[in-house]
Each structure stands twice: as C-alpha cells, then as structure tokens.
A protein has these predicted regions:
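Conserved GHKL (Bergerat-fold) ATPase module
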Residues: 1-180
C-alpha cells in the first residue's frame, strides 16, 4: 500500500494486466475494485485473451471472479497481518486506513471480511476495533434511550478545548481526521 495523504490525488494505471506474461493494458478499472486502484502491481491471468476490449472486461465472468478473488485475497492478507502482529498493524493503519474504509463503504463482501480488523483511533493515539470501542464506551457514553454516543474530533489541534471538555466528562474522543 502506498502512503496516501489526506489531500491525495488518485493515480491510476499503477496496476498492469498481463495474459500469459504478455502485456494487455494498464487500464484495469474493470478488473480491480475501485478501492484498490491506488495499489501498484501486476496481474497475470491465462483466462484473459490477448486481444481484449473494455466491453469484454466489463461483461466477462472470469474477470468478475478475478476482481472478487483480489478483494478476498487483500482482505485475508490484512486480516492475517492484524491477527499476527496487531501492534505492527496499528503502526501501518494511518497508511492503509483509506483503502480499508473505502473498501468497506463500496464493497459489501470486503466489509464482511474487514469489519473485524478495521480500526478506530482516539485522540490519545489508542486503536480499537468497532466492537472493542463499543465495549469501552458503553458505560459512560450512552444516552437516555440507551444509544451509544460517539464523540469525535476532526482536528485535534484546533478542537483541543472541545476535546478537553469531553475528557473532563470522562468521554473518549475519536480522531476522525481522514477524507473518509
């Protein structure tokens, strides 16, 4: 995953499509899910003919399977990294969270796999999964109707006085400072 800043500009054509080691195209938007278009890499598949059109890529069943397989493999690898070394995964989260968040909101199957390793970060720099965070704030951040109240800041520096006021009431404050 390349490092992405909050004001990122999408750079496409970083993934090249090959068929039996023969270059086909670097326009792979119909093969690779949108949320993974910023990745760099090579796809080589014997199932894609050498002479391929955009309409073929859009309608071919094997191309759809490749797209689903890519999504599954990325989610499985991220899940493996999370389970294997959570601290290291947390260090990488700032670089990969935009991919994961975009994937979660744009691809239901990716969401099903990613919901267990997607992280939330609070203003103290601590990371939680959504389930962990719900448990953490359940006792102190529930309204009169027993709904959880999520307090967040988009800029810790500019909103410090609000953050301190929330912390004085024993609220935990999430830091949601990304574009998603």
């Amino acid at each position: 995953f390349p490092k992405v800043k909050n004001d990122f500009e999408i750079q496409k054509n970083k993934i090249q499509l090959y068929s039996r080691q023969v270059f086909i195209t670097d326009e792979v938007k119909d093969v690779v899910p949108d949320f993974l278009m910023l990745l760099h890499g090579v796809l080589d598949s014997p199932d894609i003919p050498l002479n391929v059109s955009r309409s073929y890529l859009q309608s071919d069943a094997s191309v759809k399977k490749i797209s689903q397989h890519i999504t599954k493999k990325v989610a499985d690898k991220l899940s493996e990294l999370y389970k294997k070394d959570r601290k290291d995964f947390e260090k990488k989260w700032d670089d990969i969270n935009i991919f994961v968040k975009y994937g979660i909101i744009s691809d239901e199957k990716f969401y099903d796999r990613a919901k267990d390793f997607a992280l939330l970060k609070n203003v103290d720099g601590e990371f939680y999964t959504l389930d962990e965070y719900r448990e953490k704030v359940k006792a102190t951040q529930t309204d009169k109707d027993q709904n959880l109240v999520y307090v967040y800041a988009s800029d810790a520096g500019k909103q410090d006085s609000f953050i301190q006021a929330a912390k004085n009431k024993l609220y935990d404050v999430l830091l949601l400072d990304g574009v998603l």
